[in-house]
Amino acid sequence: MSEKTYPMTLAEKEQLEQELEELKLVRRPEVIERIKIARSYGDLSENSEYEAAKDEQAFVEGQISSIETKIRYAEIVDSDAVAKNEVAIGKTVIVREVGTNDEDTYSIVGAAGADVFAGKISNESPIAQALIGKKTGDKVMIESPAGSYQVEIVKVKKTK
């Protein structure tokens, strides 16, 4: 059985490595200390501080495991390997809805780097899936929960 790969830019991988370091060197020791303090309160069966600290420990360990997996199976995507005007991971694309002047800007990132509020959409999202591989000037049909609409790719550039 082959493992899932996680396409991402080198910058995304470096960000994950920083998050992992923060979790291992700061958050994990903080949680361990909270558990130690909560244990000192005595009876663990009715110790809400202990339960909360154990829940946080499970959350932190889950994050560590998830990030380690993403780093281990990272597939670094070189956006320079595709045409300058082609949409790919590591590129920012400006699209205009056909029939309007409404423009949107998206940076295509691996799933680990997605942040919709910052305009970073996962390569696995329906919008990115429709755009990846297309070029400046192409018209693309986007399927969304709100309905289908057509966009024209106005500009593609490397994400900074």
UniProtKB/Swiss-Prot annotation:
Keywords: Coiled coil, DNA-binding, Transcription, Transcription regulation. GO terms for biological process: DNA-templated transcription elongation; regulation of DNA-templated transcription elongation. This is Transcription elongation factor GreA. Necessary for efficient RNA polymerase transcription elongation past template-encoded arresting sites. The arresting sites in DNA have the property of trapping a certain fraction of elongating RNA polymerases that pass through, resulting in locked ternary complexes. Cleavage of the nascent transcript by cleavage factors such as GreA or GreB allows the resumption of elongation from the new 3'terminus. GreA releases sequences of 2 to 3 nucleotides. One of its GO terms (molecular function) is DNA binding. Belongs to the GreA/GreB family. Gene3D superfamilies: Transcription elongation factor, GreA/GreB, C-terminal domain, Transcription elongation factor, GreA/GreB, N-terminal domain. The keyword Transcription regulation applies. It comes from the Bacteria. Residues 2-30 form a coiled coil. Disulfide bonds: none annotated. InterPro entries: GreA/GreB_C_sf (IPR036953), TF_GreA/GreB_CS (IPR018151), Tscrpt_elong_fac_GreA (IPR006359), Tscrpt_elong_fac_GreA/B (IPR028624), Tscrpt_elong_fac_GreA/B_C (IPR001437), Tscrpt_elong_fac_GreA/B_fam (IPR023459), Tscrpt_elong_fac_GreA/B_N (IPR022691), Tscrpt_elong_fac_GreA/B_N_sf (IPR036805).
